[in-house]
Amino acid sequence: MLTGDESLKKRPMKPILNSLETLGISTESDDGKPPITIKGKINGSEINIDGGISSQFISALLIIGPRLENGLTLNVNGNLVSKPYVDLTLAIMKEFGVETNTEIPYEKYSVEHQIYKPTTFTIPSDFSNLALLLAANVLLDDGLEIDINLGEMPQGDEAIIDILEELGVTVILDGDNITTKSPKVLGGGRFDLSNTPDLLPALAILCLKSSKPIEIFNVKHARYKETDRISVISRELKKIGIGVKENDDGMILTPTKNHTPAEFNSENDHRLFMAFSIASMYIGDCTVTDPDSVQVSYPNFIKDMKNCGAQIIPL
């Protein structure tokens, strides 16, 4: 049986459960959500899966493919979201000695029965979390110099650099350090996050310093994360005075000069807690719920923010 914390129990898993059942596995779940019971032995070699909800399903199936007796042919139906994460999966599999045949990019893959081989692998800095630190740097007057290890793995969330530059920020990469030089007021723009949904929280809070609307679109799959991030971000930013038009696949954020201190409800979502905490540091006198959620991805977040001068007081 597989389960998780309360936020993970909200995540829809039906696409991958349906695929596993195609391979002969029996599954039981709470309407496609954890806890999930898995029984049986895989006896198939070709499956179809919906690519429109999460690329994580495709990554998981690709990773098990080499260990199946007859290998695996994977057909991705619909428009695959978060494509760079599939590229990253394939690159890491190759590092460990597994070759994958990309028959049609982002639509059809096949992998023969193979054995993963031990290797030495340096994990690069995670741009999903780095994006939040860069957003903090922009909002808090560029006081941070962040040590990083970029590595050579493809990371879609590296797009945060292009996004910041479109908003008027200069991003400075100097060896293993990254910092920013920001204008007093940011610009606005339209941003397609179809391949980078984890950038949504970082981009959304940058509207606190913008002078023009920020439109975020093609990120409907962010509704299927630990929370419905489009809905929660829209609701919470309204509390501080941001004009929000929530769309099915994103939002339009209209900035204000006067921000109202508020209590942010992060709904136990680690990325939202971090984003709302950074927004609170900019506004002042705010409260953010669920600090323990950062244990999922960035356990030292609060400590690091305090080291940067943030006044964070547990309640």
Regions from the language model: what does each represent?
Residues 1-315:
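Short, structured segments at the rim of ligand-binding sites
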